[in-house]
Amino acid sequence: MKVTWEQGFKRIYKKKIKNNQELKKRFWDVMELFSKNPFSPRLRTHKLTGRLEGLWAFSITYDCRVIFKFLDDDRVLLIDVGGHEEVY
């Protein structure tokens, strides 16, 4: 699975994850798993509804989610990352 980042995602990553070493390590561990199997039960990947219809989400931690979009069978675009209340 090829993973690309939306420009806005890069800014959010730098702001919320980059300087938190524990969350940063967890993020990259989860991203490795996601790139191998985006529907691993550990990720709790799910389709979104309502105003976010067409997008998907998976969990980094209990409260931290990544919002993404499937571009095709082999590519995804990361859109947002943050707490449940921030991204939904």
For every predicted segment, state its role.
Residues 14-24, 59-88:
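Enriched for short, Lys/Arg-rich terminal
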Residues 1-30:
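Arg/Lys-rich, positively charged N-terminal/basic patches that mediate binding to nucleic acids
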Residues 8, 53, 83:
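Residues that form or immediately flank small-molecule/cofactor binding pockets and catalytic motifs
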